[in-house]
């Protein structure tokens, strides 16, 4: 199990030295990824969800809080001692067109991590190729066709399956899928999503899905947990289906209101809404961070930052002092 405890991450700002404001990408984020569970981080671009995924994989360091993996605090470890823990968490990158070395065959791309494992375990000769072929078969590809080919010879969907196979070479316990279907053809997305669901069932791996798409989060996260992130803060957390069917925080309601409705087939929820203004990343309101854009903002929203908690008998946790249950999701007509 992986637990984030008050994770913060701040980057240097842009501009002159005298007027440079730091960028707070994450502001005290708490989360839990259970063994074999499905967790989704959802939010608009720039909310901090990818930074959180990079911290989980060891690509970025956190400057506050702690990351606990199976009871071990990573804050207490030196960077080199964290490597075995991060090896158990593998990233499935967003862009399959740049994630694979174009000068190498798929067989050699998969062989690098497998050769390392073979040396560590004393595997027999021929194991690397056999394991590479097995992993390609696991992700629905023909090994005889794919192994000798270069990335440019494969379609986008096939490349993404190779990226997934490469992540599986080290037998990870957690897969972090960062917008894993956003760069491939719409007609191929469902196949990749179903593959990730099947891998979670077959291998028992935990799945963290990072996305801005409510539909994909719901497809992968059914029966799991959903974290809604806004400007580096979790503003709503709970069961995926509960949040999508009964959103409490206005930001979650705005995200759901942005889902297109098929005219003549669906009817929009009666309370769909959009933010009042575009996001100004430089603004630092004294209270709720969503208050300048919130259609439901009141004067007391500026008093203090609301804590993430259960309010008014809600099942999920949310950070709004004036939650309203609203019907924003499209329904069949």
Regions inferred by a protein language model and the residue ranges of each:
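Charged, flexible cofactor/metal-binding loops and thiol motifs
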Residues: 17, 238-333
């Amino acid at each position: 199990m992986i637990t984030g405890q008050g994770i913060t991450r701040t980057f240097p700002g842009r501009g002159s030295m005298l007027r440079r404001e730091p960028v707070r990408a994450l502001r005290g984020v708490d989360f839990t990824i259970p063994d074999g569970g499905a967790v989704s981080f959802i939010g608009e671009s720039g909310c901090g969800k990818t930074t959180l995924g990079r911290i989980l994989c060891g690509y970025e360091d956190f400057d506050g809080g702690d990351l606990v993996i199976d009871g071990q605090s990573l804050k207490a470890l030196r960077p080199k001692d964290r490597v075995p823990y991060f090896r158990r968490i593998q990233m499935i990158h967003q862009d399959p067109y740049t994630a694979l070395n174009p000068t190498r065959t798929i067989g050699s791309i998969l062989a690098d991590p497998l050769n390392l494992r073979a040396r560590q375990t004393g595997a027999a000769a021929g194991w690397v190729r056999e394991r590479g072929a097995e992993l390609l078969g696991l992700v629905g590809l023909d090994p005889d066709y794919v192994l000798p080919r270069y990335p440019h010879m494969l379609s986008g969907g096939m490349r993404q399956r190779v990226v997934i196979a490469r992540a599986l070479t080290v037998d990870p316990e957690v897969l972090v899928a960062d917008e894993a279907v956003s760069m491939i053809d719409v007609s191929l997305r469902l196949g990749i999503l179903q593959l990730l669901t099947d891998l979670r069932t077959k291998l028992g791996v935990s799945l963290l899905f990072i996305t801005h798409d409510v539909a994909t989060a719901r497809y992968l996260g059914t029966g799991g947990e959903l974290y809604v992130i806004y400007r580096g803060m979790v503003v709503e957390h709970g069961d995926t289906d509960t949040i999508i069917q009964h959103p409490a925080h206005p930001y979650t309601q705005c995200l759901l209101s942005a889902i297109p409705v098929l005219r003549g087939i669906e009817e929009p929820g009666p309370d769909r809404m959009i933010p009042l203004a575009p996001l100004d990343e430089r603004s630092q309101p004294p209270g709720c961070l969503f208050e300048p854009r919130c259609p439901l903002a009141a004067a007391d929203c500026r008093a203090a930052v609301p804590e993430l908690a259960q309010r008014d008998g809600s099942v999920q946790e949310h950070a709004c002092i004036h939650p309203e249950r609203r019907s924003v999701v499209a329904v069949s007509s």
